[in-house]
């Protein structure tokens, strides 16, 4: 949606809930 490439990289690097929550906040 907004940036699936960055969200996927951050989700795997930090966590599933943290990556999703940050993607929704941005």
From Swiss-Prot:
Which key words tag this protein in UniProt? Ribonucleoprotein, Ribosomal protein, RNA-binding, rRNA-binding, tRNA-binding
Q: Disordered: where is this region?
A: 1-26
Q: Which Gene Ontology terms cover its molecular function?
A: rRNA binding; tRNA binding
Q: Which cellular components does GO assign to this protein?
A: ribonucleoprotein complex; ribosome
Assigned protein family = Belongs to the universal ribosomal protein uL16 family.
Stated role: Binds 23S rRNA and is also seen to make contacts with the A and possibly P site tRNAs.
**Subunit structure, interactors included:** Part of the 50S ribosomal subunit.
Name of the protein this chain belongs to: Large ribosomal subunit protein uL16
Source organism per entry reads Geobacillus stearothermophilus (Bacillus stearothermophilus)
The top of its lineage is: Bacteria, Bacillati, Bacillota, Bacilli, Bacillales
**Gene that encodes the chain:** rplP
